[in-house]
């Protein structure tokens, strides 16, 4: 038995937690460089604002003065996400973190202790108490059905935010009301083909022939059908699989033409990638840098390139990774272009910093490297300040545009909200 716990309109909810004056008002969050809408409050949805809609389009609408807009505050969202997951860990037997705002919960044996819906409300209330965020809870025998139940919990207010779909009759009634496009893992393209075969609802899909589904689609969709029938095909993954690569990349707030600006950006991306690498307790062997101009720019020749540097000893020391990244940058930089995007990629991971060397290699790891990196990470996470490397520069004119950024309420002492 599974529960899927999902925060309602996560990004906008994170913003309104610290701005109670915005409760009940239309709020949206925009993507990198304040480009497109990536999160909407219920009130914003009711105005017809669509997900992915360019921000400049809603600026000129008659209702624009009533909308509260925020740039993406990833530090705030990550911190609140961690608090939500920690709360679920403390109240549940085991969980699988599925994304930044949702997690599957293992409810095996819970029926012997209390009604499943009661436990769902308990989780919901505890998350609200600890974080101020409202979640929806869907409960069922399989992950796919739990997703369906969660969809219903968030769609119909009468449910109170919790739907227990363990009853087969309730499953069939809900599936009959659910478009096949809304089933987990089925997008617009697959749903169109299913519609052409007369499969329009989740119930139609659940009652389809497994042989027909496997013939016209694949084993993944067959597994979805089995899950809709209550047959568990997907297990709870308590431990995330080890990452095969780490990418840190952003589009720039404006086109970069100077090497010094690009150098600062690459140093900053290398530092962030190194932090992520250490959080995974991994070491990398290859550091790659890519950059490119806009393929859509008028009267400009497109240029894009990538270069990699192999470290002799796998490392997660920011100094080593910055050094390799800047060496790679020198190999791909070409003057005369207006660059719109660049990034750093780390690959070839090791679980420790030891690798086989050639007989005459005398390279060794930096002394006290692990202790220094741990100290820097702790200081940067504490909110007491930010330690950065000189190559990143001070005035980051290349940084992505975030003109409507909210304070770092939970990660910076100077931004702590004052209780009144």
PLM features: what roles do these ranges have?
Residues 1-226, 235-236, 363-420:
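Gly/Gly-Pro- and Ser/Thr-rich, intrinsically disordered tail segments characteristic of DNA damage-repair
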Residues 23-25, 133, 283-287, 305-307, ...:
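A generic structural signal for short beta-strands and their flanking turns/coil linkers
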Residues 98-102, 140-143, 282-286, 337-341:
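Short Gly/Ser/Thr- and Asp/Glu-enriched loop/turn motifs at secondary-structure junctions
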């Amino acid at each position: 038995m599974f529960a899927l716990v999902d925060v309602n309109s996560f990004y906008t909810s994170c913003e309104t937690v610290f701005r109670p004056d915005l409760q009940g008002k239309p709020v949206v969050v925009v993507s990198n460089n304040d480009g497109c809408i990536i999160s909407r409050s219920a009130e914003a949805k009711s105005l017809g604002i669509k997900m992915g809609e360019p921000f400049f389009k809603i600026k000129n609408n008659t209702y624009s003065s009533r909308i509260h807009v925020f740039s993406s505050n990833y530090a705030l969202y990550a911190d609140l996400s961690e608090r939500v997951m920690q709360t679920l860990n403390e109240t549940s037997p085991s969980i699988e973190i599925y994304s930044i705002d949702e997690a599957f919960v293992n409810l095996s044996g819970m029926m012997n202790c209390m009604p499943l819906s009661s436990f769902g409300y308990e989780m919901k209330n505890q998350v609200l108490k600890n974080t101020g965020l409202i979640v929806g809870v869907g409960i069922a025998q399989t992950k796919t059905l739990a997703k369906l139940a969660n969809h219903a919990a968030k769609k119909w207010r009468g449910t109170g935010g919790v739907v227990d779909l363990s009853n087969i009759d309730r499953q069939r009634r809900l599936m009959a009301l659910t478009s096949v496009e809304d089933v987990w893992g089925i997008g617009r393209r697959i749903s169109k083909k299913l519609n052409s075969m007369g499969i329009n609802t989740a119930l139609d899909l659940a009652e389809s022939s497994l042989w027909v589904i496997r013939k016209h689609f694949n084993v993944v969709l067959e597994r979805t059908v089995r899950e809709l029938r209550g047959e568990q095909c997907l297990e709870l993954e308590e431990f995330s699989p080890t990452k095969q690569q780490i990418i840190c990349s952003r589009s720039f707030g404006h086109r970069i033409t100077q090497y010094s600006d690009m150098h600062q950006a690459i140093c900053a991306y290398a530092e962030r990638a190194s932090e992520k690498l250490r959080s995974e307790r991994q070491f990398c062997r290859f550091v790659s840098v890519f950059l490119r101009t806009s393929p859509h720019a008028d009267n400009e020749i497109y240029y894009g390139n990538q270069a990699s540097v192999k470290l002799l000893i796998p490392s997660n020391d920011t100094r080593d990774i910055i050094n390799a990244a800047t060496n790679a940058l020198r190999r791909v930089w070409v003057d005369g272009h207006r660059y719109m995007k660049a990034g750093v990629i780390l690959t070839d991971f090791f679980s420790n910093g030891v690798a086989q060397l050639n007989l005459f290699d005398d390279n060794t790891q930096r002394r006290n490297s692990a202790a220094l990196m741990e100290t820097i990470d702790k200081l940067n996470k504490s909110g007491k300040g930010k330690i950065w490397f000189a190559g990143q520069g001070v005035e980051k004119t290349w940084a992505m545009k975030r003109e409507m950024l909210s304070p770092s309420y939970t990660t910076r002492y100077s931004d702590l909200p004052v209780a009144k």
